[in-house]
């Protein structure tokens, strides 16, 4: 259970008090919690604080008060920690490698410390872990933790606030019994992931288990909760589905945008605390603005003290050179600039779903390891058949089987058609669990590397029954590509890894389903398919327009798709560079947008193009976004793509800054003045500045005990002795130890307990500090080579330029696709003057940096993704992005995959043991990139990028490189019809082929050959697929526990065409158990009855007695000869009309059969029936019939069938379809 734990035993300490103060600013949440725990044990123990995080939350402050000690954390370069850069081996007392202690400090209390806590790639994202050192008996521990989060939205557009479970744990009536049961269940579920939990075996397995246990407390605790709401617009209402709440307006509130929420009654401790906020304009784009901590003049002074600026200006002192340096430093100076946050939740809930227009790329990833043999594979086959038949003609699809290796049905996703569907059904019928162990990482990498299809969101369906030994890598891979890939996972059986199945869905905003023994897969598969087929706004991008005098860094860097209830979030860091531009043009604009992921791989953050005259004054003060209502799509589409493109081409000197991946850049609108904080607030300190003196209110320490080097803070003009002494979390927000703070020593004296080389202070907050000339940043060194040669100084600005620049006007354009229709929304905003308002409300605002935290987190994620993508292309080329992520992390005190939290005992001026280790850290890969690049170059083939997967991706015991296993027909076509590039690298590999050799050109060639192959084999595949599902044993004999004869609907579903129709033939009669004669006699179409009366073998109408016996088989309606009808009524009708009527009647009868004979399994075939009905609605019914007539005739058929089954005398001649 998360919270404060005994490091050795894993036991949780009871919570005695929880005080939560929070603020919602638009769609962002800033939260500060004060958690007090009591040590009721008589023995001291090592404390470990574990705090779970969701995908949109980051920790921005942490402090723990333990008696006379204060513990905080500091962000350090993970590579230096893991490489031994901070190794204290030279310290007189022995210690564990990687832990930093002050020289001469005894570490006797840690001599019996168990092994370190191991965090894999996934756990380090979703867990905050801090070592608190020794906690004395009967001692209270107060923990202050601050987080910033992006809030989720509901389909209605409401904003949801859910208090973390650690801050408000439940109190069960029988806590001991309940907790023990929960732990046992969690361990039993995921024994392959987590292992057994025994005292002294504290490791990553236990931490993973913690995530599956319910957070509870053995007793009631003191609970206080306060939430300030600063809405993006007027609030339509605030409610709580869990508690009665009280709403009060702050004394300084100017409108209904701001309100304060508290609990009206005492907390009941039996449920979480949830608040729903309803904006008055929930489906319009909203832009919110948060100012930086420096004015324009202050930033200019700060900039002149930076080493990269000094070096750059020596080479060329022109004004353009200065703006270039500012642009390249934007990620380091995020706290100093204004941040804009764009939020947009389109109204997809009110859209009437149209299944036939459902777009998407459906990829089915099926576990074919040996453990899937037997009943599990039979279940998967039936579920896959239903899933394939449920897809719509507008989509793309592919099937991939994986085990130790993997194979794909198609070289790339194919259009859903009769040909591809027939081949897929045939492949499913022959599928076996014969591919060895379980290795899901390699096929996932192959899927993610495939090009994204415009207008088709990638929807990945994963079916597995096992576990892998690299769950963290798998989840991190999917997390990094969640913008393009959404995962719906299915876990079969008791041995499946729950963390893997749930994690795949959680990190990609999909859904997870776990099947118990004997449970059917079809209803859960259809449930997920319905979610995937919901209305979607795909290819969502944001384009920003700013004046020429600004430099902007936008995030994220990838286009995304929005399903009902999801929102678009984007950030922009805006620097006003008007002081550094000579002769600026007021009508000149810059347009910031993004590239698609398959386009340029060059640096996009700093590449730009000019933009000509753009915004007019009248467009800069309004939000012109329209609600996203598909019924009013024409009104919502403010500007089509074509018109926008033509307009752009006519403008001169456009400037466009790109971000490497296809990203949505978002911008916020100016935030109106909100109510001040309801509680007294301390002086405002920037995020990265330590506020250790505030802790004197919780301890008996005086200022002398804080022996910390706070020179950077002193240089910024702040008096550390003047902070007001306030109590409670509402009085201040804890922060992390700033990068410039080191243990107190005489100036100039170095301590060995900290690093042998002092940490670089290139990004310290002191405007006058210069960066050291040694150890220049690798990022700055690399980019400096791209600078222009020295030239004469031209930075003299116009003397008449005003000292205070004019407000910055901007515009954001949100674009997306829905049903192949381009839609666009526009919102304008005004930034105002840069920097805080001195002496104003912002100085006392505790929540004035929430957007900065989230923007820095988004920028770091962008750099991490860019580094990963560049690393796949060429090892070593991603170094610049890794260093940029590292710089941003340390400058903004936001964690990244290249940095780590290091605990610091402030009162003793020393580091505590880090406790945490990262076995698969990306930082280690940074250190070994050169050696790894040589290894990859040796194993790469012809395309300039690695063609196989490394051994670390393989299943346990498999040390070979992974390859794409291409088996016999139908996938054997790859060996027969390969492109030249494929033959070159696959000829010597036999049945196995290289993983990544399907380049874009070779894929197009294979697809052409593949399509020809399908056309030649269409009839054979259709017949084989139908016979396979008709001839296989009944599933009822395997799984059915009841005598319901409606169970076997699979044979009928297997006959459905890709369009949704059914053919009237013998296979259809066999699947429905209805003789052809009865189908034709009861058909409302004349051609069907005439075909019976005109056959040479029959000369009279069959009697009721004949109908009760098995009639002879007849050819299908769509294939019987028309020659006997030449003399009849339909003799002149073309064959196409006869085939069409056969499809109409068979489809109506098929729907009626499902409803009549398999109603109890409606949740399994509902999409199949919906597709068939959708096809019917689009057809014209001949002979003057209507669809109502067809459905009535089908219902009458089953009335007659019931009479025939009961052997009742019934005169067929009394039935006339014309009277129905």
Curated annotation (Swiss-Prot):
Glycosylation sites: 140, 650, 1017
Segments of this protein annotated with the region Disordered: 715-807, 937-962, 976-995, 1093-1115
Biased composition (Basic and acidic residues): 757-774
Residue numbers bearing the Phosphotyrosine modification: 881
GO cellular component terms, A-Z: extracellular region
UniProt keyword annotation of Secreted present: yes
Cellular compartments annotated: Secreted
Pfam short name (any one): VWA_3
Biased composition (Low complexity): 796-807
VWFA domain: residues covered: 361-529
Residues annotated as signal peptide: 1-18
Every VIT domain range: 19-149
InterPro entries, per the entry: VIT (IPR013694), VWA_domain-containing (IPR052627), VWF_A (IPR002035), vWFA_dom_sf (IPR036465)
Compositional bias annotation for Polar residues: 1093-1111
CDD domains listed in its UniProt record: vWA_interalpha_trypsin_inhibitor
Annotated protein name in UniProt: von Willebrand factor A domain-containing protein 5B1
Organism (species): Homo sapiens
GN (gene name): VWA5B1
């Amino acid at each position: 259970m998360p919270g404060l734990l005994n490091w050795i035993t894993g036991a949780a300490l009871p919570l005695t008090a929880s005080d939560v103060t929070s603020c919602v600013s638009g769609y962002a949440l800033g939260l500060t919690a004060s958690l007090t725990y009591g040590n009721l044990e008589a023995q001291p123990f090592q404390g470990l604080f574990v705090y779970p995080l969701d995908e949109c939350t980051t920790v921005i402050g942490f402090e723990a008060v333990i008696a006379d000690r204060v513990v905080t954390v500091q962000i350090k370069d993970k590579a230096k920690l893991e490489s031994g850069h901070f190794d204290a081996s030279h310290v007189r007392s022995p210690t564990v490698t990687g832990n930093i202690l002050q020289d001469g400090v005894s570490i006797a209390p840690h001599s019996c410390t168990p092994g370190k806590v191991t965090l894999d790639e996934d756990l380090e994202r979703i867990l905050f872990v801090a070592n608190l050192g020794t906690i004395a008996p009967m001692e209270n521990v107060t923990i202050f933790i601050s987080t910033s989060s992006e809030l989720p939205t509901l389909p209605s557009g409401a904003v949801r606030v859910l208090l973390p479970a650690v801050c408000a744990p439940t109190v069960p009536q029988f806590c001991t019994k309940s907790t023990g049961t929960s732990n046992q269940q969690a361990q039993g579920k995921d024994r392959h992931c987590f292992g057994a939990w025994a005292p002294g075996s504290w490791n990553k397995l236990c931490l993973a288990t913690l995530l599956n246990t319910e957070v509870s407390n053995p007793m009631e605790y003191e609970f206080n909760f306060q939430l300030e709401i600063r809405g993006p617009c007027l609030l339509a209402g605030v409610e709580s589905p869990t508690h009665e709440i009280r709403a009060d307006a702050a004394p300084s509130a100017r409108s209904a945008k701001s309100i304060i929420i508290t609990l009206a009654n005492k907390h009941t401790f039996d449920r979480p605390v949830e608040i729903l906020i309803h904006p008055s304009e929930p489906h319009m784009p909203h832009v919110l603005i948060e100012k930086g901590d420096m004015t324009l003049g202050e930033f200019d002074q700060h900039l002149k003290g930076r080493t990269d600026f000094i070096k750059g200006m020596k080479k060329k002192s022109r004004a353009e050179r200065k703006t270039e340096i500012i642009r390249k430093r934007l990620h380091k100076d995020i706290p100093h600039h204004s941040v804009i946050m764009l939020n947009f939740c389109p109204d997809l809930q009110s859209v009437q779903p149209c299944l036939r227009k459902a777009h998407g790329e459906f990829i089915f990833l099926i576990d074919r390891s040996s453990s899937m043999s037997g009943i599990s594979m039979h279940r998967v086959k039936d579920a896959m058949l239903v899933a394939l038949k449920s897809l719509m003609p507008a989509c793309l699809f592919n099937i991939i089987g994986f085990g130790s290796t993997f194979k794909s049905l198609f070289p790339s996703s194919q259009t859903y058609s009769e040909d591809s569907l027939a081949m897929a059904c045939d492949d499913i019928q022959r599928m076996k669990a014969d591919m060895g162990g379980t290795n899901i990482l390699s096929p996932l990498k192959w899927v993610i590397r495939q090009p994204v299809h415009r207008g088709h969101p990638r929807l990945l369906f994963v079916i597995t029954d096992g576990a892998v030994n690299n769950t963290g890598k798998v989840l991190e891979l999917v997390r990094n590509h969640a913008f393009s890939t959404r995962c719906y996972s299915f876990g079969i059986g008791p041995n499946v890894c729950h963390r893997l199945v749930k994690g795949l869905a959680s990190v990609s905003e999909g859904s997870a389903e776990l099947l118990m023994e004997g449970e059917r897969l079809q209803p859960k598969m259809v449930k997920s398919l319905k979610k995937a087929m919901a209305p979607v706004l795909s290819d969502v991008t944001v384009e920003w327009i700013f004046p020429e005098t600004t430099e902007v860094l936008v995030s994220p860097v990838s286009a995304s798709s929005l399903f009902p209830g999801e929102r678009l979030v984007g950030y922009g860091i805006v620097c006003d560079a008007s002081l550094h531009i000579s002769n600026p043009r007021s009508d000149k604009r810059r347009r910031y947008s993004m590239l698609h992921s398959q386009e340029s791989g060059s640096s996009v953050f700093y590449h730009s193009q000019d933009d000509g005259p753009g915004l007019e004054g009248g467009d800069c003060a309004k939000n012109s976004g329209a609600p996203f209502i598909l019924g009013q799509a024409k009104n919502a589409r403010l500007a089509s793509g074509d018109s926008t493109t033509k307009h752009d081409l006519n403008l001169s000197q456009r400037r466009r800054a790109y971000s490497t991946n296809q990203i949505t850049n978002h911008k916020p609108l100016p935030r109106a003045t909100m109510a001040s904080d309801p509680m007294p607030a301390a002086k405002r300190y920037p995020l990265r500045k330590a506020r250790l003196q505030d802790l004197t209110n919780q301890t008996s320490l005086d200022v002398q005990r804080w022996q910390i080097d706070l020179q950077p803070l002193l240089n910024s003009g702040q008096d550390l002795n003047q902070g007001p002494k306030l109590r409670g979390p509402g009085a201040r927000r804890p922060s992390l130890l700033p990068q410039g703070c080191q243990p107190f020593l005489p100036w100039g004296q170095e301590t060995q307990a900290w690093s042998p080389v002092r940490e670089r202070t290139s990004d310290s907050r002191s405007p006058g500090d210069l960066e050291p000339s040694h150890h220049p940043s690798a990022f700055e060194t690399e980019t400096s080579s791209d600078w222009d040669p020295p030239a004469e100084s031209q930075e003299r600005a116009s003397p008449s330029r005003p000292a205070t620049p004019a407000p910055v006007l901007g515009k954001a354009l949100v674009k997306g696709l829905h049903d192949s229709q381009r839609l666009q929304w526009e919102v304008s905003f005004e930034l105002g003057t840069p920097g805080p308002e001195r002496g104003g409300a912002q100085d006392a605002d505790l929540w004035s940096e929430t957007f900065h935290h989230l923007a820095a987190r988004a920028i770091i994620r962008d750099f991490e993704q860019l580094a990963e993508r560049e690393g796949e292309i060429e090892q070593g080329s991603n170094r610049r992005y890794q260093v940029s992520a590292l710089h941003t992390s340390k400058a903004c005190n936001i964690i990244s995959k290249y940095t780590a939290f290091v605990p610091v005992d402030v009162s003793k001026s020393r580091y505590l043991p880090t406790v945490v280790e990262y076995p698969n850290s990306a930082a280690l890969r940074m250190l070994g990139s050169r050696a790894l690049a040589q290894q990859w170059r040796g194993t790469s083939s012809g395309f300039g990028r690695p063609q196989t997967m490394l051994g670390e991706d393989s299943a346990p015991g498999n040390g070979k490189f992974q390859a794409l296993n291409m088996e016999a027909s139908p996938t054997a076509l790859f060996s027969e019809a390969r492109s030249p590039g494929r033959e070159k690298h696959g000829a010597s590999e036999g049945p196995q082929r290289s993983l990544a050799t399907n380049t874009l050109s070779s894929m197009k060639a294979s697809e052409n050959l593949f399509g020809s192959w399908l056309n030649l084999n269409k009839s054979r595949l259709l017949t084989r697929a139908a016979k396979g599902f008709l001839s296989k044993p009944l599933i009822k004999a395997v799984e059915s526990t009841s005598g319901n004869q409606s169970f076997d609907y699979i044979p009928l579903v297997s006959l459905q065409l890709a369009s949704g129709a059914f053919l009237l033939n013998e296979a259809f009669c066999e699947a429905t158990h209805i003789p052809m004669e009865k189908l034709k006699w009861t058909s409302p179409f004349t051609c069907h009855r005439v075909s019976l009366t005109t056959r040479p073998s029959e000369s009279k109408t069959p009697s009721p007695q004949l109908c009760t016996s098995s009639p002879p088989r007849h050819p299908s309606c769509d294939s019987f000869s028309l020659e006997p009808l030449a003399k009849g009524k339909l003799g002149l009708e073309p064959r196409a009309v006869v085939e069409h009527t056969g499809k109409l009647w068979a489809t109506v009868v098929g729907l009626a059969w499902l409803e009549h004979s398999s109603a109890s399994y409606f949740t399994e075939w509902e999409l199949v029936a919906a597709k068939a009905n959708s096809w019917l609605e689009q057809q014209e019914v001949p002979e003057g019939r209507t669809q109502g007539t067809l459905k009535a005739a089908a219902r009458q058929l089953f009335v007659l069938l019931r009479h025939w089954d009961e052997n009742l005398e019934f005169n067929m001649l009394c039935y006339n379809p014309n009277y129905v």
